[in-house]
Amino acid sequence: MNFLSHFYFDRNTPNANIVLGTILPDLLKNANKSWNVHPEKHIALFGKSGLNTLLQGWKRHLQVDLLFHSSSFFNNKMQELKRLLIPILKDSPVRPSFLAHIGVELLLDHLLIEHQQININSFYDNLEAVKANDLT
């Protein structure tokens, strides 16, 4: 799932750190593909309240991804899109399965916006509300 789709599940949380935590796994992966961060395996490092709520969001991200990526909806739509992409990407280094995966997620983000299921300003307001000293 992509950023707005993750936000959808926690759009009503009063804690901005949780919202940041729900998108942080994908943000880090986008920043550097070689980073393989697993804070959920080091819970003792997250005793401080701000860090703990960030970790709550991170764990929520993992739970939602596990459910979504194992759903028949996601897998069926990904396969449909992949079939359409295979001939287009035949000479490309981009794997059709990768692009289909991201494509389905971005389409879901688009649909959430189009059907006004999320408030984009609220998403960015939450990110802006995260206090730097909560994260150290």
Question: What would you call each of these model-derived segments?
Answer:
Residues M1-F98:
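An N-terminal structural lobe/cap that precedes and organizes the functional/catalytic core
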Residues I88-T136:
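Catalytic cores of phosphodiester-bond-cleaving enzymes
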